[in-house]
Amino acid sequence: MDINQDLPAIDSHRALQIWITENLKMLPLPERAHGNFFEECCYVVLHVPQSPKATQGGSSDLHYWIGKDASAEAREAAVSFVQCLQEDLGDQTVLHRESQGHESDCFHSYFHPGVIYRKGGRDSALKFAETNMYNVQRLLHIKGRKHVSATEVALSWNSFNKGDIFLLDLGKVMIQWNGPKASISEKARALTLTCNLRDRERGGRAQIAVVDAENEATNLLRIMEAVLGCRSGSLCPSVPSNSVSQLQKANVRLYHVCEKGTDLVVQELATRPLTQDLLQEDGCYLLDQGGFKIYMWQGRKSSPQEKKAALSRAVGFIQAKGYPNYTNVEVVNDGAESTAFQQLFWSWSKELDRKKHPEKSKLVQGNLEVGKLHTQPELAAQLRMVDDGSGKVEVWYIQDLQRQPVHPKYYGQLCSGNCYLVLYTYQKLGCVQYLLYLWQGHQSTVEDTKALNCSAEELDLMHQGALAQGHVTMGSEPPHFLAIFQGRLVVFQGNAGNKGERPPVSDTRLFHVQGTESHNTRTMEVPARASSLTSGDVFFLITSHVCYLWFGKGCHGDQREMARTVVSVFPGNNKETVLEGQEPLYFWEALGGRAPYPSNKRLPEEVWSIQPRLFECSSHAGCLVLTEVLFFGQEDLDKYDIMLLDTCQEIFLWLGEAAGEWKKEAVAWGLEYLRTHPAERSLATPIFVVKQGHEPATFTGWFVTWDPYKWMNSQSYEEMVGNSLGPGSAISEMTAEVHNFQLTPRLSDNKAGHPALQAFKGSQDSPENELGLDLRVDGANPSMNHTSSCSDSMVNGSLPRERLMHQALEDLPPGVDPARKEFYLSDSDFQDIFGKSKEEFYSMAKWKQQQAKKKLGFF
């Protein structure tokens, strides 16, 4: 059979399309089956980004997914299909190999709130896609923080552990059991998945219960024990995470792959840091990212045979290296590289990319349009400006490890031996916003830096936690910081005096002026010698008698105008303008004589549109672990998270309000991210810490849409639990019926399952039936260990009717469940009041029970 003739039609207007492969055919899955993967199958997944801001450079992503129990034939068919599809889709398609339980972040990002691994093969998959099943008994093991997965495991207490979450799914009853070591964020995300399963597969009809503390949920444990049997012994300990640290991901090696005769040659070319010029357009290259992921890069002039062999070569490399079979593989084409691939290199030149693909060369203009910054946050993000810098400014500096105010006349005059706090207050759509910059001089001490951070915490407390914080290193100030001082930022060598006074300009000093506008101009003191000059810029040479304003031959009008503005910072000296090549003798004498210096013109800096990356931060064994969220939106920011947004020029750490003690690690995590980055990023990159509900436009502008009121409606985990349980009476009804269970396992009936389950299954055969949990089984349990965790059988109580009927909660006898007051009646009183036996009553539909209880004073 010719696979090419059986390729499915591609709908370019659908973001996600999934096929299951079987017998040389690709069978499409309906959308409601997306995210469910059967372990004996292989799948093909195509993602075509629909939003320009959510793309990876405009490329599509083609994945083939391998179930852990898939046959060799199914795997081979999947490979053949994806290779033919990739050829049909063209060079703008990135090919991924995914293995069950070890999928890439890109793959997981398609499926919210998570992926589900199910037992079975093609028949089970197609049956699931066609019908809505209520006759279900399964246990799902739920794992993950940002990328959640649920795996079907054996119905046994042996499947449980203390650190994860398990969902006992009984069709119309779904019990989420939370391990005592599970975090609140894991519980919340698991509950979101549970609710999604209820709504997608059960039409919202199933009832959800949550076990957070077993001693407070004895009724629910009775149901679990009916299904799982008696639990003997303690639970298994938490399973260590298999997360890959950033340090391991930073270990990158590049290989050239080619054929010499009949031999395949794999030659190592370079290790970290890699440079883009190593990739030649007529070659094929393999990039090994610490054994965590293998990339195959194909030059646009490489042969069709080489392109077709890329995947098999990557798999062969994995086997030769002894890496796990589930190691991720990504095949990328020249010009369609993902952002993750590009950032493995020390730099990814748009100039080189533009020469190959001129149609992609669109420069983002850097002109500041102040009026649009508040209404167009995407512009604010690109220009890195929350406004034009005209707001209120307060400045402090660290002296003797204390925060001291700087006199306003010295604002913008910083010293390399000090640390400064710059508090900027501005209005955004009628609301007061704060941005606190922490500026660190190159010659400041470690003690000063600690005092700087402590002072920032104090200021944050004074402003009720509303400060966004920007950690700035001398010489790497962001545009908005420069705009605050209207282009007059001058950094002196040495330490500040009283009230932040600059060092006295008594000796000869040389200052380098760089910039053309108020938001990109800084003036830095440099060694006063001729070799510090460059022909492309402007310099001030200050002596005891005169201030020379030196214009290099390569500088242009905007630079000269800004320099004339900055020179006003140095009052009192006679000012003389000197052109390069026309310097007076005294100019050179002041610099200690002539010396060679760079004479090339400064090229204008280009600001390119880049694809930002969003990561969830966590720590494992003391190392930073990042989980990337692709195609991200505001909904990916969870109140329990610390998220890292990398825009290349800046790093943002977003702190959810419930992130807890990890908030203190945010800046350290940002520095570790830069330090362990495969591209060896500069540690001077500005790091901004922003808090939930106080995000500046320079952060929100990187998101497709942003709702400033979203956080006002955010729910706590406890509120999520309450809302997930449906009407307040629903869970009470279920637990009331649990007290009717007489749990008696029959060991001789293992194949059929627990007798209680047989009764329970019978009540679920029709999705139209109301929930009926009559799991009572007569007889004693001869094998029950009284020291085990199994609950004792509930014996019907007998209380006078007057102590139960029409009684408020506080007036009920101790131990009476207010949701099932009628249960404590004697059998004769129950028959007399309700006109039927308890057995007949509890076999009624729930709404009928509720109606009768309300009428007779038991609600």
UniProtKB/Swiss-Prot annotation:
Gene3D superfamilies cross-referenced by the UniProt entry: Severin, Villin headpiece domain
Family matches, as SMART domains: GEL, VHP
Keywords from the named record: Actin capping, Actin-binding, Calcium, Repeat
Domain named HP: residues: 793-859
Family (UniProt): Belongs to the villin/gelsolin family.
Highest taxon listed in the record's lineage: Eukaryota
Keyword Calcium: yes
Gelsolin-like repeats, residue ranges: 24-76, 148-188, 264-308, 401-450, 521-561, 624-665
PANTHER family: VILLIN, VILLIN-LIKE PROTEIN
Keyword flag Ligase: no
GO terms under biological process: actin filament capping; cytoskeleton organization
GO molecular function list: actin filament binding
CDD domains: gelsolin_S1_like, gelsolin_S2_like, gelsolin_S3_like, gelsolin_S4_like, gelsolin_S5_like, gelsolin_S6_like
Alphabetized InterPro entries for the sequence: ADF-H/Gelsolin-like_dom_sf (IPR029006), Gelsolin-like_dom (IPR007123), Gelsolin-like_dom_sf (IPR036180), Villin/Gelsolin (IPR007122), Villin_headpiece (IPR003128), Villin_headpiece_dom_sf (IPR036886)
Pfam families xrefs: Gelsolin, VHP
Function text: Possible tumor suppressor.
Name listed for the protein in its UniProt record: Villin-like protein
